[in-house]
């Protein structure tokens, strides 16, 4: 949605109430926070409903909005609880929820049709078809992938129906958002459930190649304004109030003055938090120098700034009109430019001795105490008939009711009924992805015998052989769409019938090409609601998230990845490149962690990389459990011909092959 030249919203983080106060003090237009559940920062302090209510009222009093993250992937039994939680958020007046799970988005839209939804960056939206597909779900705003160049951001803004939000400052993941399984499958802490252990910050055989410097686009403010994005987002719900205030204050100034940061302002940003400097490499497409770690100097600078800072509460100055007249209830109206509220109190009585005085009434009305309001006596317009009495407790009650009503953001919330979602039987199929198509050719006889569909990378020449389905690359930017569309048309004309959909945007691309879409595990289907919604969008069947255990896959339905090295990361940067790209990628490139585990890295289309798991998911020795699955999926990547043949024999012919290092589905079988 184009807004060229309009000043975008400055959206700031808050992990606790002090950080929220700091964001408002710094000049935030909106603040985003997490609740105690269903948020992607499970280890932040976060907010309970009472704190959310207080924070929301504080934001609204100061002309800011409050968004709440409900952006983890959900299991079937959690959808109803999450929907009821969203109803509570709606009731207290939250401006929008930020979501990742397609099943939850569908449930919210059905139960709370006017509740604003923003699509989390975890949905991996990186092009216009993706943004429009998400918009069709009832989502107003899309948070784009952080890895996009400015030209690609501009294209989505210009061509999509959705509002566009981009990240402005803060921590960067080396993996495309929503696509990282490293912490989950290696360490048991699921990033898509808010538990990321940040293995990317650890050293590997190539050094700290997974640890990126923090993002800072302070040098690109004029271009970002001109791009027409609706919102610029600062990361940092795990950061201190001092960090939030400093970063918000500087970007507020830069936006208002429509200029890039000075050297002094960059230095101040670095003092707030830095990993050896900042990077703008994704926006500019210049990846050199993107990695960095926290030095002792960085840590000391942040500690010193945090120790000096106390946010404090800014009280909202309001005005009042009060009327106390014989025979009528006393009234008090509080008002500002943005809102007003009238409270009705007790009926005054004729005074027996000392009647009310204007000064005494104003004195009591101005005592706003622990509220968020300030009401100076000079801001009170009082109409007072003489000879009347209203007790101090009655005046205080009138003031309390007026303050509470003025602060309140509550709205009527409908009683919600959980949308019915009958379990859809899993469609029977056995599929395989060969990331090295020459391996598919080598074991061709077995493929024809045991697999319904075999997928090969779209841009490999095997994709035009006519007998394979095509694996659409997980990242396709607007600048790459024409190449992908052309290649899909060529594959279709050559005889391809199916496409492996690894991103929500591919639903449109596959439909345009006339191909049957199979949803890859990267669509992050973890519940039957999401699976049903993808079917409604045109996906024939989905492969469950690789994070689901076998019992969880029975709840959601869908295909299960029973074999293969699961891709843990999809990176925009190429680890194999040394200087100018020769186009000849090494066949045996990997990273090794401190325990000696080796993670193979293979080339993805567009000079991107896939980091594969060190351990192979293997289940052939559990034939009873596996044979009960209606749909199974295999991934072949680093195997040689002999290994691939042995794997196929183990699953389909009773062979005794057992890999050296293997793991089970999800976290256990």
Over which residues does each language-model region extend?
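Surface-exposed amphipathic alpha-helical tracts and adjacent flexible/coil segments at the periphery
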Residues: 1-26, 30-42, 53-56, 62-90, ...
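Glycine-rich, highly charged phosphate/nucleotide-binding loops
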Residues: 47-52
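A cross-family signal for key residues in well-ordered alpha-helices
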Residues: 106
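Residues at the C-termini of beta-strands that transition into short coil/loop
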Residues: 121
């Amino acid at each position: 949605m184009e807004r060229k030249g309009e000043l975008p919203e400055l959206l700031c983080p808050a992990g606790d109430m002090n950080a929220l106060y700091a964001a408002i003090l710094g000049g935030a237009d909106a603040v985003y926070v997490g609740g105690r559940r269903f948020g992607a920062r499970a280890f932040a302090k976060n907010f309970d409903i009472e704190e959310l209510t207080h924070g929301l009222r504080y934001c609204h009093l100061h002309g800011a909005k409050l968004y709440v993250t409900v952006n983890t992937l959900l299991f079937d039994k959690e959808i109803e609880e999450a929907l009821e939680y969203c109803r509570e958020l709606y009731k207290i007046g939250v401006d929008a929820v930020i979501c990742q799970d397609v099943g939850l988005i569908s449930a919210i839209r059905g139960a709370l049709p006017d509740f604003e939804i923003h699509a989390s960056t975890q949905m991996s939206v990186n092009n216009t078809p993706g943004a429009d597909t998400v918009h069709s779900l009832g989502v107003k705003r899309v948070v784009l992938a952080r890895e996009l160049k400015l030209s690609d951001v501009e294209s989505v803004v210009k061509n999509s129906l959705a509002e566009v939000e981009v990240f402005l400052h803060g921590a960067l993941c080396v993996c495309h958002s929503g696509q990282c399984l490293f912490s989950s499958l290696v360490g048991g802490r699921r990033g898509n459930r808010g538990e990321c252990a940040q293995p990317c910050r650890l050293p590997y055989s190539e050094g700290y190649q997974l640890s990126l410097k923090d993002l800072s686009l302070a040098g690109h403010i004029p271009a970002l304004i001109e791009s027409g994005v609706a919102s610029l987002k600062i990361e940092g719900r795990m950061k201190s109030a001092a960090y939030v205030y400093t970063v918000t204050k500087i970007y507020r100034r830069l936006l208002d003055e429509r200029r890039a940061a000075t050297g002094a302002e960059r230095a101040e940003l670095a003092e707030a938090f830095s990993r050896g400097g900042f990077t703008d490499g994704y926006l500019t497409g210049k990846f050199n120098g993107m990695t960095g770690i926290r030095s002792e100097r960085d840590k000391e600078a942040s500690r010193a700034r945090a120790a000096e800072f106390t946010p404090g509460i800014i009280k909202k100055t309001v005005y009042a009109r009060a009327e106390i007249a014989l025979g009528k209830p006393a009234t008090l109206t509080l008002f500002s430019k943005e809102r007003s509220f009238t409270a009705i109190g007790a009926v005054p009585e004729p005074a027996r001795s000392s009647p009310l005085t204007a000064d005494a009434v104003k004195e009591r009305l101005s005592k706003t105490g622990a509220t968020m309001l300030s009401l100076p006596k000079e801001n009170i317009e009082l109409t007072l008939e003489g000879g009347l009495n209203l007790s101090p407790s009655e005046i205080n009650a009138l003031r309390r009711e007026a303050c509470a009503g003025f602060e309140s953001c509550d709205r009527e919330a409908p009683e919600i009924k959980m949308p019915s979602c009958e379990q859809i039987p899993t469609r029977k199929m056995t599929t395989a992805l060969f990331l090295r198509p020459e391996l598919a050719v080598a074991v061709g006889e077995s493929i024809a015998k045991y697999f319904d569909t075999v997928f090969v990378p779209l841009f490999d020449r095997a994709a035009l052989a006519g007998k394979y389905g095509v694996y659409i690359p997980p990242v396709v930017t607007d600048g790459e769409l024409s190449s992908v569309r052309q290649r899909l048309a060529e594959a279709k004309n050559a005889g391809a019938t199916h496409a492996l959909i690894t991103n929500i945007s591919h639903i449109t691309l596959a439909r345009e090409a006339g191909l049957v879409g199979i949803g890859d595990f990267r669509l992050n289907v973890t519940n039957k609601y999401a699976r049903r919604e993808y079917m409604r969008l045109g996906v024939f069947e989905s492969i469950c998230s690789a994070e689901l255990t076998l019992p969880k896959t029975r709840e959601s339905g869908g295909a299960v990845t029973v074999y293969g090295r699961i891709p843990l990361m999809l990176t925009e940067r190429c680890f194999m490149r040394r200087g100018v790209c020769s186009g000849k990628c090494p066949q045996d490139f990997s990273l090794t962690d401190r325990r000696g585990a080796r993670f193979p890295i293979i080339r993805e289309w567009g000079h991107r990389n896939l980091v594969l798991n060190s351990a192979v998911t293997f289940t052939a020795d559990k034939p009873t459990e596996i044979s009960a699955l209606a749909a199974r999926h295999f991934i072949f990547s680093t195997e040689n011909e002999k290994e691939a043949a042995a794997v196929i024999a183990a699953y389909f012919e009773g062979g005794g092959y057992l890999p050296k290092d293997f793991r089970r589905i999800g976290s256990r079988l």
